[in-house]
Amino acid sequence: MHSLQRKVLRTICPDQKGLIARITNICYKHELNIVQNNEFVDHRTGRFFMRTELEGIFNDATLLADLDSALPEGSIRELNPAGRRRVVILVTKEAHCLGDLLMKANYGGLDVDIAAVIGNHETLRTLVERFDIPFELVNHEGLSREEHDQRMGDAIAAHDPDYVVLAKYMRVLTPEFVARFPNKIINIHHSFLPAFIGARPYHQAYERGVKIIGATAHYVNDNLDEGPIIMQDVIHVDHTYTAEDMMRAGRDVEKNVLSRALYQVLAQRVFVYGNRTIIL
């Protein structure tokens, strides 16, 4: 006797009347129970997005073939198991984002399997190994950016992760590296993009006398800090904050934004279309 499975069906297609009925009727035909369903129409682009969480006994090939015959030309659909995903985390020396992810993964705040943490410095090895997670060093010294990214990419690929998380990984990635993991690399940026791109963002913010500081979690593409935005948040500051005060406050925002973004990504709620995301 087959046990029930739970899977997530994600659909992107040109908008037409009756799409929800077509998709749900096919699920009914396959005797699948719809646990949750969310949809959105982007009227500007004429695109329909739908996330459907299903439970039942699946014949993936037949289900997808039936969907293909019912959906308009140019449709994208994917069916993946619901639940726990695998990630590899990349780090340099800063511990706040990594530590938050390790704690949440260990105590149930994130339903994730951290396959490994890989760094270009040894600084965070002790922290990682306290959680019985492998730490791997891929030293960048003496290597070109391309050579180092090749070694780093090979180390990541050995773990076959669903996503790669940059937890304050302070290296600019080559286009070749990004191309190996399309729409799978998630970065936390230390400002409310597009403001204060580059180094020393909190010092830039202090010099400008800003009244809010924030953080942005986004997918990585070939343009530095310009990939599709997943999550953002800000906190209010005032003239009494030094650059160091802003940095401390900013670290709290960074770790919260990264974990919230990762929560949505792991649940397969984030759709990438162009340089935007839709979260269902």
Feature names for model-found ranges:
Residues 16-36:
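Short amphipathic alpha-helix segments
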Residues 2-14:
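Short glycine-/aliphatic-rich beta-strand segments at the starts of folded cytosolic domains
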Residues 40-280:
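One-carbon transfer enzymes
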